Amino acid sequence: MLSRYSRSLSTLIPALGLIAAAASPLTVVEYQLPRERAFPHDPAVGADGIVWYTDQQNSFIGRLDPATGKITDYPTPTPASGPHGIVVAPDGGVWYTAQRISKLGRLDPKTGHIEEFSLPANARDPHTPLVRKGIVWFTVQGGNTYGRFDPRTREAKVWTVPTERALPYGLVNAPDGSIWVALFGTNKLGRIDGETGALREITIPQTAARPRRLVVDEMGMVWYSDYARGYLGSYNPKTGAFKEWLSPGGASSAPYGIAIAPDGRIFYDEARSGTMVAFDRKSGQMETIKIPTPGSIVRNMAVDSTRSRIWLALSGTSRIGKIELK
């Protein structure tokens, strides 16, 4: 069942509004994973439509072929490595962060071979990876650092976040070449210079805000899930303006994974309600989509723009989810 409404709170115009509910055909289709206690944390999708995911609990990299429903598991070379984030590079290579052993891993999709790469000592607890110009960037939540790894030279460089215990988490590319990071332990966002690695912190006006994941749209606007306060937030780097929308589930809904759909809507998860939310940037309206299996938490999602699909890692339920937008 899907309902629609809108509540917006701007840091410049503190006004609330309510819009009547409306129906929608969107649903979440689920794929059961082969292990009962599989724990999919992050998904990624390649240009060929194949979905990859990390099974953090069992230390597997999973492959799902949507055309056949076939699922293939690849155990990580180091047992109990705790794979967390995952990304498919332009060359097809599948990169992931091995959280428990302070390494990066690369899976060759043609052979299934996985190679691990050790990170510096101050890169303890790597979390979210992305690829920019062939370089793998990553956040290190426990070490309060972030870094980059060059696959050609196998050299890594790590920087410390200025604010202590900032817990750098979500990491995304922006159209202008910069990289944005959610500083989950603070009420701050971070902008990383994609060439120099220098980080500039931006403070969210609400001191209790805790951004967990974020995305950047085609205009450079930053959208983030405020996990602590139950809001969807936006930041305009050009004007410095922040704006917020209270999530349908309210202050305790715990917004988590977030993505931009091919049609421009912002999709995010309410971790404590088992609900996906679709936000229309033009109208400010929100739609709620109930995830079928109770206890599902979407820590991250992946967008297949070519096929108009959003893939969800349904942590806690041993499932992968799909939303068809067509």
List each language-model region with its residue ranges.
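Beta-rich, blade/repeat-based domains predominating
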Residues: E36-D48, P79-D91, W95, P120-K133, ...
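Blade-level signature of beta-propeller repeat domains, shared across WD40, Kelch, NHL, RCC1
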Residues: I297-K326
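Short loop/turn segments that connect beta-strands within beta-propeller blades
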Residues: D65-G69, D108-G112, D150-R154, D193-G197, ...
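A short loop-to-beta-strand structural motif that recurs across blades of beta-propeller domains
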Residues: F60-R63, S102-R106, N144-R148, N187-R191, ...
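A short helix->beta-strand "capping" segment at the edge of beta-propeller domains
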Residues: A23-R37
